[in-house]
Amino acid sequence: MIEFLHEHGGQLMSKTLEHFYISIVALLLAIIVAVPIGILLSKTKRTANIILTVAGVLQTIPTLAVLAIMIPIFGVGKTPAIVALFIYVLLPILNNTVLGVQNIDSNIKEAGKSMGMTQFQLMKDVELPLALPLILGGIRLSSVYVISW
């Protein structure tokens, strides 16, 4: 074991760093896409149910099958891996964002409206901070997914 590490230690470290790079890029892209879409979807329950169902179906596809589909489109390399991981980590963030914003007490929203807040101010100053624990829970779950796949 020590001999193997001595011979291939540099390559092991570079591949580990490459894995972290791919994982972080996929996770950041998923956060950038899923949180705003989740906020928009939280306003319409019917559309949210349709989109979350489609995202859930996409997540049931095995990773190797997604990679097999991505390689002819994007070629071999980091790009198909990032796209495949992005698809897999999108759902927990999207789902938790929608649930976090939808489950805010209507009395709290009403209090913000009665103070004269615009829809944007209400989202920025009231809804988003209250939904943040659930959103961060989705990001945490997705970070575990992205590292393990």
Task: Tell what function each PLM region has.
Residues 37-69, 85, 95-99, 110:
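Cytoplasmic-entry segments and transmembrane alpha-helices of multi-pass inner-membrane transporters
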Residues 24, 28-36, 40, 86:
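Generic alpha-helical transmembrane segments of integral inner-membrane proteins
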Residues 102-113, 120-125:
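Intracellular coupling helices
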Residues 24, 32-33, 61, 65, ...:
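Residue positions within transmembrane alpha-helices of multi-pass solute transporters
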Residues 1-26:
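Periplasmic/extracellular loop-to-transmembrane helix junction in inner-membrane transport proteins
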